[in-house]
């Protein structure tokens, strides 16, 4: 392996059949490991590829940056992505996450704040424990957002299985589809389209489906103890 006991600035090609370890790293070239890559803060506008894991503190992946891991990517700080991130495993973020471009993960994605204006495809589950704002496109199997802040969607969220959205306010002006959708919030405002195959539950909520809003379930719409303002379409087949 390669161990660099200080900061790394790479504009060439660094390759190893073992682990690559460095302090703060600025990469404009290529870093390739057949095993693991670990750094402190990572500033990448080149290519970084690990056959196994990438571990870092803060990650700033620039427009031309490509990050690729055969297993997991772990960030012990914040992540900002303007480039491309691909991992066959999970993407674990201790801090906040901002995505402007493209992320593909084969496992889970966990973070505090999630701000997505790009394309976010997560094979298993997205878990957010901070504010959630989506102005891009999200595709995942499961979505679990639990925040004291707000949940905002103005574009597209497709969840193949279950969605749980808990927040101070939930505002949907875009498109949400899921098999089951559980909403836990004092106030829901929908001017977009919500389509659910099975059950929508939104109990103890000020439920505002405003003009142009559509909320439909192929099975059950459960709105117990909720104040309902409907100026759009509410639909349930059972």
Residue locations for each model-derived region?
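Extended beta-solenoid/beta-helix repeat architectures
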Residues: 1-238
